[in-house]
Amino acid sequence: MTDIKQILTDLIRFPSITPEDAGCQKYMIQFLEQLGFTCQQLNNGPVSNFFACYGKIGPLLVFAGHTDVVPVGEVSKWDTDPFSLEEKNGVLYGRGVADMKGSLACMLHMARRFIKTYPSFPGRLGFLITSGEEGDEFNLGTPYVMQKLEQQGIVIDYCIVGEPSSSLKAGDIIKIGRRGSLSAKIHLSGKQGHVAYPHLADNPIHRISPVLAELTSMQWDNGNAYFPPTSMQITYIHCGGHAGNIIPGELNLHLNFRYSTEQTDESLKTRVINAFTHHNLNPAIEWRLNGEPFLTNKGILLESCKQTVLEHIGTLPELSTSGGTSDGRFIAPYGVEVIELGLVNATIHQVNECTSLQDLNTLETMYFSICEKLLID
């Protein structure tokens, strides 16, 4: 029988740099179909997606994840071939071993073991997999699949996202939510002119400066028990001109908010627009909602996960909402209990990305135990 390491070896061989899947999902679908899963591919443009389900009735527990990985960077800086799994002293190296093909290998191995142990369990086990998580095509992935499932009347009860949530060892941190992300591209027009004749020009830098001073000093909220205060960062400023004696005629500015459940995207938009209005400016603003905040601070899934972690590593997990966004933000709005439980994130997106064989085995065992609690007990 193929063990977890061999499954991971197979997955790492696919150079699935986002949004390319490169054969990962074909491998996973074949694996799951051999176990009796019904699989449907839901590809969308350059992004590959599939949903798989075992069982006909009862609560539906879905394991969600992505097959795409970030680029490897300079291959010469790797100590190993990034697309060939290599073990050194119990540590496994390769692009995606932690984020998140290691979790996928645990999910597949667990599914086979669970179905062999409980072939007629009173529930349903599912997989929701995309190759569009790491890049700009994320809207073609999980949110698209969720729309299709809703159209088919498929309701997910519980979802475990296999993102690398842990800090020192598998299970020490569970993500119970994530902050929302809102971006703005702002264009402010002025009038180009010579610096010696400012009365004949209109400098957009000068005009926007008091607005930026107001926005960067603003206390958006105080956060709450689960989220830190909302933050805003200026991520890009560019003006025309490119000469020391020219007043630029336009300015482009990008902002990003990471916001708590104390805010909504509309409340943030209103405050930004009001700041510009207060200074008699009316720029063109293009908004992009990358994801709303979500929180699973209670429920059967969370309690099952907490108890499972305690049983397997001896301590209760830290419950956190820190870090960037994840695809959980597209699943939670459908009323699903969502948590993230995965491997250690210390080396994700880095050269020599790695995870330990011990953590893989621990994570697989925890996934199995959670399935028992939700689908058997």
UniProtKB/Swiss-Prot annotation:
Coiled coil: none
GO biological process: diaminopimelate biosynthetic process; L-arginine biosynthetic process; lysine biosynthetic process via diaminopimelate
EC number: 3.5.1.18
Active site annotation, chain numbering: 68, 133
GO MF annotations in UniProt: acetylornithine deacetylase activity; cobalt ion binding; succinyl-diaminopimelate desuccinylase activity; zinc ion binding
Pathway note: Amino-acid biosynthesis; L-lysine biosynthesis via DAP pathway; LL-2,6-diaminopimelate from (S)-tetrahydrodipicolinate (succinylase route): step 3/3
Residues that coordinate or bind Zn(2+) 2: 99, 134, 349
Note on how the cofactor is bound: Binds 2 Zn(2+) or Co(2+) ions per subunit.
Superkingdom per UniProt: Bacteria
InterPro entries for this protein: Bact_exopeptidase_dim_dom, DapE_proteobac, Peptidase_M20, Peptidase_M20_dimer, Peptidase_M20A
Keywords of the record: Amino-acid biosynthesis, Cobalt, Diaminopimelate biosynthesis, Hydrolase, Lysine biosynthesis, Metal-binding, Zinc
UniProt entry tagged with the keyword Metal-binding: yes
Cofactor requirements of the protein: Zn(2+); Co(2+)
Family listed: Belongs to the peptidase M20A family. DapE subfamily.
Function field: Catalyzes the hydrolysis of N-succinyl-L,L-diaminopimelic acid (SDAP), forming succinate and LL-2,6-diaminopimelate (DAP), an intermediate involved in the bacterial biosynthesis of lysine and meso-diaminopimelic acid, an essential component of bacterial cell walls.
Protein's name according to its UniProt entry: Succinyl-diaminopimelate desuccinylase
Organism: Legionella pneumophila (strain Corby)
